[in-house]
Amino acid sequence: MSTIADPRDILLAPVISEKSYGLIEEGTYTFLVHPDSNKTQIKIAVEKVFGVKVTSVNTANRQGKRKRTRFGYGKRKDTKRALVTLSADSKPIEIFGGPVA
C-alpha cells in the first residue's frame, strides 16, 4: 500500500456526464481518483480540498476499453471512480463553476 501525501494527488478530476449531473442535485459528487487510494483517503481528501462534511464514499473500479490500433489491439488504462455523498448541512461543491439546473 503506497501512501499518498497530498490530498490533491488523490482526486484526479470530476466526472462529467448526465448521470453525475443528476446525482449532484442529490448531494452526491463523482470523481476520478487515484487507483491505489482507499475510501478513507478519498473522504479525507474531499473534506480538506473542498471544506465540506462527507457522509459516505462508494468506489467503482472500471476496466479500460480494448481499442484497435494499427499495431494490433491496445487497452486504455483502468480507472477508479468515487461517488462521494455530502451531509445535508454541507454547502454544495462548485466544481463546474456555477449552480446546477
Curated annotation (Swiss-Prot):
Signal peptide: none
Entries under SUPFAM superfamilies matching the protein: Ribosomal proteins S24e, L23 and L15e
GO BP: translation
Gene Ontology CC: one annotated term: ribonucleoprotein complex
Pfam families tied to this protein: Ribosomal_L23 (PF00276)
GO molecular function: rRNA binding; structural constituent of ribosome
InterPro entries: Nucleotide-bd_a/b_plait_sf, Ribosomal_uL23-like, Ribosomal_uL23/eL15/eS24_sf
Top-rank taxon: Bacteria
Family: Belongs to the universal ribosomal protein uL23 family.
Subunit and partners: Part of the 50S ribosomal subunit. Contacts protein L29, and trigger factor when it is bound to the ribosome.
Function of the protein: One of the early assembly proteins it binds 23S rRNA. One of the proteins that surrounds the polypeptide exit tunnel on the outside of the ribosome. Forms the main docking site for trigger factor binding to the ribosome.
Protein name: Large ribosomal subunit protein uL23
Organism this protein belongs to: Rhodococcus erythropolis (strain PR4 / NBRC 100887)
Gene name per UniProt: rplW
